[in-house]
């Protein structure tokens, strides 16, 4: 397992990177927290959330290692009876996954992003009594440290 300091650094870098997605339907993608400010007129929110920590997948004889950071992007909307809004949520998250394949994050000195890729297609994973629904896409970042 990667050190907590390394994971914190990766999480911060990934959040900055996710917020460069040009087609995000919100002003800011947040970390591990979805809030909708009805008073401000917000009707959607997005968050990056880590999944089960970061794993070292390979150690190199000459030093350094390769690791995998698993995360998901969550999109919360209130679609009402609109199937079109639901489909648009999936489409936007799948588009994020496509964008992520070609846009490597800057992870700082000594850490090199190898690839970012979705591990699933977007899907709905929660519905709430107040009418909001959460959609998610699961992803992973492969990176090298001190190589």
Regions found by a protein language model. Give the residues of each.
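Charged, amphipathic alpha-helical segments and their flanking helix caps
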Residues: 1-36, 52-147
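A short, hydrophobic beta-strand-centered structural micro-motif
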Residues: 43-50
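Beta-rich nucleic-acid/ligand-interaction surfaces
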Residues: 35-43
